């Protein structure tokens, strides 16, 4: 009960918990019965084996049974408006992951020119952090090659001018997870049909892609609720991005959130990340 597991993961988490617990008990029993440490009596041997097996089983539980702790990522724009050194000095290694936002003029005509070299800077500052990228473009195919070099997940929008399956396949061919973006301002009839072949889904909760500091789109709550009621909900991770703060994240059921202005404009960005993590997992 010290681990906060979303309701739709109860069955899977319980299965992992029982499997790991039974396996660890079986291993412990046979090791204790047939193995004795030299110069140690039976009771001490059992105590040592029990401790070792417990630590191994506990780590497996963390990795599998209770792996669904909600995560907070910070958004970094792939342009020249932000300085990576400044961002790092504010948040250091406190974010759970790094979310890279990229938008071109097909989705926002007022956007500045991209700076793809920032990927190298990001990777240098956070070498062990997971990088998830969000391509906001109606023609994402031309960007997949460069994004695949640095990303573990590449999100793209459903409202594009290219074939969705082709984009998805190109991302997968680069051994990267494709993620589908749904915009909260749109209404989707068959959500399950749209997301059923994805392990990662992102809901964009602001009106204009690529602009930080916008208000949370209230209709987003309805879309999030519809997605969380899907019968296949445990098959994908849900990420919520845009306009998030302490006031609304407590009402959001998801695995990950993305924050930019709420963290960076705070007087203590590191503490704010911790606050968001606590609220999400409370």
Per-range role (PLM):
Residues 112-133, 170, 174-179, 183, ...:
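Alpha-helix-loop-beta-strand connector modules within alpha/beta enzyme cores
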